[in-house]
Amino acid sequence: MKTTMNQNPIKTTKVMSKIIVTIVFFISSYVSAQGQFEQGMGKALQLWGEGKSTEASALFERIAAAEKSSWLPNYYVALVNTNAAFGTKDKEQVSLLLDKAQKALDVEMDKNPNNAELLVVQAMIHTAWIAFDPMTNGQKLAGPVMELYAKANAIAPENPRVVFCKAEFEIGGAKFWGTDTKPMCAQIEKAIGLFATFKPETVFSPSWGLERAQIAQKNCK
């Protein structure tokens, strides 16, 4: 299927920053008097919240090298750099950011290819490439993105990020083709409900997405 969809499902920097705000809010009161891993993760998230993506990524990378049993540091390396790529127009910089994100994610995907949170970030990396150059990347990556979301949805159908991000991407395709977005809007509403009951495994586990979903709901037609 040929597509040159002008994917911008994440509304670049302003909307992506909601991820940072949400994460920092949940960890801000937690990191004092914790162990080295917790303190490092808290510091890295704080740096990200301050807009210091490069420093945050570097610290997450150091934590990942020291704590190989946790998938979260590399997850955040991938998320931080993918987030930064959405706000970048320079081709060389986008390539550097997304290559770093991909390498970090690959480490954890090799360990657990059925982690739905990792699958969502892989889909986001592909989407960042599409958003940067839809004419070149839309045709070859739109299909893999949908396959990733389908797999994630089969694994974790009640995960709000899976439901929301899948619907958000599908809305981009529907708008490009001029098809009805109501089914996707219904899925966004479902995701908002799932956020209300979703319980992260740890304070550092993924919990972002509600504010993005609420913004998408307001814009849903």
Residue ranges, per PLM feature:
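Short coil/turn connectors between adjacent alpha-helices in alpha-solenoid helical repeat scaffolds
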Residues: 44-48, 85-97, 129-141, 173-183
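Alpha-helical segment of the N-proximal tetratricopeptide repeat
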Residues: 39-54, 59, 87
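Canonical positions in the second alpha-helix
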Residues: 63, 108, 151-152, 191
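TPR/TPR-like (Sel1-like) alpha-helical repeat modules
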Residues: 97, 102, 139-147, 178-199
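Bacterial Sec-dependent N-terminal signal peptides
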Residues: 1-40
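Amphipathic alpha-helical repeat scaffolds of TPR domains
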Residues: 35-42, 66-87, 114-132, 160-173, ...
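Outer-membrane beta-barrel transmembrane domain signature
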Residues: 137-145, 149-152, 157-163, 170-179
